[in-house]
């Protein structure tokens, strides 16, 4: 089995169990049976994830000697923090702004984002992000970020569509977060993967990468399950 076959197989396995499709909370989100307050519970927590995500690439950039990997990290930062898209900075709003627009449409004030407190399961994800940025071997850390970016497509296909269909979010405002992320994933498809595969050279590299990807998946599952417990049907 080649490294690419191994990577694609593991990614497919984990995506087939995506908590954003399988969890009771997200099934109810997709069907429109949550209240606005219950829907906001996820949006608010996911904002914390989005706010921390670029810092993984900042951390990897500072400790990686490989120039091509550092360029890939810099590209991610441009996309997340400066809206780089279709070859230009500002091609989209920055990702923090995109998330605040969801709150605009759901009736939550922008300054409220600064007071969001992480639930324990989201705090665990953020703690893992810190480890990815500063401790986990950077090739393994990039594999975990690539898995999370694949999950973004799942989120767009459930949460993004449901916000428009059921919760009064405008396509050209709050829902832009999801259409932009889908478009970015299509544009960037394969870039990070090509960078990663060059550096998964040994069995130990693959073991570290698999451990990081499975831990990312486990934490997302735990988060999704916690939403179902906090907001029972």
Region spans (language model):
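Non-heme di-metal
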Residues: 1-233
């Amino acid at each position: 089995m080649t490294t690419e076959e191994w990577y694609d197989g593991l990614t497919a396995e984990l995506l087939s169990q995506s908590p954003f499709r399988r969890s009771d909370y997200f099934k109810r989100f997709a069907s429109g049976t949550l209240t606005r307050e219950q829907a906001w519970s996820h949006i608010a927590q996911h904002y914390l994830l989005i706010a921390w995500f670029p810092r993984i690439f900042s951390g990897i950039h500072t400790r990686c000697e490989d120039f091509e990997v550092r360029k890939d990290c810099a590209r991610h930062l441009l996309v997340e923090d400066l809206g780089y898209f279709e070859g230009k900075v500002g091609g989209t709003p920055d990702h923090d702004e995109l998330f605040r627009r969801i709150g605009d449409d759901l009736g939550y004030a922008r300054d409220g984002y600064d007071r969001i407190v992480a639930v324990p399961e989201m705090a665990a994800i953020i703690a893992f992000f810190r480890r990815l940025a500063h401790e986990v071997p950077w090739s393994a850390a990039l594999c975990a970020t690539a898995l999370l970016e694949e999950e973004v497509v799942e989120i767009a296909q459930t949460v993004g569509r449901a916000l428009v269909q059921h919760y009064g979010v405008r396509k050209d405002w709050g829902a832009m977060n999801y259409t932009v992320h889908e478009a970015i994933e299509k544009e960037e498809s394969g870039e990070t993967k090509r960078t990663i595969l060059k550096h998964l050279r040994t069995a130990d590299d693959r073991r570290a990468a698999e451990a990081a990807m499975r831990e990312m998946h486990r934490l997302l599952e735990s988060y999704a399950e916690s939403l179902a417990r906090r907001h029972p049907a």
